């Protein structure tokens, strides 16, 4: 009740503060780098970290970033006579430490060259080296790069490329569904833009902590690392479902009240009073669940827990309980505007029973 009154008095202030806060937290997202955490991200004293450090001490950081270069002859040529040239070309590249093995095929049209970079698997120098080898031009020979490190780099890049398409697809579908259900243009637009804000803040916060190395010890991480390559996709999927649930909890009650009274401000107040507690309780439950992930020893599980915990905090408590009602108050009746031509085209899903109420009123 008190929160609803405060929002009703200063909706512009609450909307502005919420949007500004999430926008600022989102800034690190724009330099987010994806990768796959390795054993160097475990805490010191663990078996994984001790083994990693011993191998680095003996063979260098690049031991954990070994690359498998496949030299393939073009147009029925052969590679054997060019092995020395190939090795010289590879060793001349920046950040190549040493070649560990060369295995030519007996027929001569192919050879496998294994090499170690000077840097680790998540270093930008290693990523650049993979691209440099693939783009190298040696007459009559085509170079391919594979191995665990190269595959992780490729997966990270593929996921980065797929992220905008995935996000636009599910956000676009949600906009259409919400438009059909709530018979409005601005309500679904506000819902999906609110999700974009909370998603940006979530990934920005994770980047600031995990990648930029701010307060990572507080959350139980041993060191900074790149952001888990499949985390954005995973976060979008899970957080989007939760965010839209919270949105439906709030807005369906607002829609019901508006359909009955026609008073937009009263509808928002009813939604906050009667559904706000549900959103708060649901958010706290999910925060408790996801925070438990951060107790795990595995760095990847910790990162997932961090992202989802703060994702729910940002969406449930800042977007849904602060920005959404404040913006709804500011929009007034315009929030429920739907062009007549569009209203006729869209299927009518009467989730609030408005048609039944109208029929009953006619009979009276």
Q: What is each model feature region?
A:
Residues 31-216, 226, 248:
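Structured non-transmembrane domains adjacent to transmembrane bundles in polytopic membrane proteins
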Residues 1-34, 138, 145-364:
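Membrane-embedded transmembrane helical bundles of large multi-pass transporters/channels
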């Amino acid at each position: 009740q008190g929160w609803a009154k405060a929002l009703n008095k200063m909706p512009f202030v609450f909307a502005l503060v919420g949007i500004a806060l999430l926008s600022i937290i989102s800034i690190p997202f724009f330099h987010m780098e994806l990768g796959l955490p390795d054993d160097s991200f475990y805490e010191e004293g663990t078996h994984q970290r001790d083994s990693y450090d011993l191998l680095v001490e003996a063979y260098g950081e690049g031991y954990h970033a070994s690359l498998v270069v496949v030299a393939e002859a073009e147009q029925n040529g052969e590679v054997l006579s060019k092995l020395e040239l190939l090795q010289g070309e590879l060793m001349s590249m920046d950040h190549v430490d040493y070649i560990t093995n060369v295995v030519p095929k007996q027929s001569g049209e192919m050879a496998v060259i294994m090499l170690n970079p000077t840097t680790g698997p998540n270093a930008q120098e290693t990523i650049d080296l993979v691209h440099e080898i693939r783009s190298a031009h040696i007459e009559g020979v085509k170079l391919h790069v594979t191995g665990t490190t190269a595959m992780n780099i490729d997966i990270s890049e593929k996921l980065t490329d797929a992220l905008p398409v995935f996000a636009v697809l599910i956000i676009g579908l949600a906009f259409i569904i919400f438009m059909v259900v709530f018979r409005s243009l601005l309500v679904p637009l506000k819902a999906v833009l609110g999700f974009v804000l909370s998603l940006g803040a979530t990934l920005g916060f994770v980047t600031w902590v995990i990648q930029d190395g701010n307060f990572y010890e507080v959350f139980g991480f041993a060191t900074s690392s790149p952001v888990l390559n499949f985390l954005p996709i995973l976060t979008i999927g899970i957080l989007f479902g939760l965010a839209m649930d919270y949105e439906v909890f709030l807005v369906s009650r607002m829609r019901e009240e508006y359909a009955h009274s026609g008073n937009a401000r009263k509808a928002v107040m009813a939604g906050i009073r009667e559904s706000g507690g549900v959103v708060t309780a649901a958010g706290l439950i999910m925060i408790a669940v996801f925070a438990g992930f951060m107790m795990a020893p595995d760095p990847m599980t910790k990162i997932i827990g961090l992202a989802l915990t703060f994702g729910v905090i940002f969406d449930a408590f800042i977007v849904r309980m602060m920005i959404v009602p404040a913006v709804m108050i500011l929009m007034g009746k315009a929030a429920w505007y739907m062009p007549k031509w569009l209203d006729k085209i869209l299927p009518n899903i009467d989730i609030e029973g408005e048609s039944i109420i109208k029929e009953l009123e006619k009979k009276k």
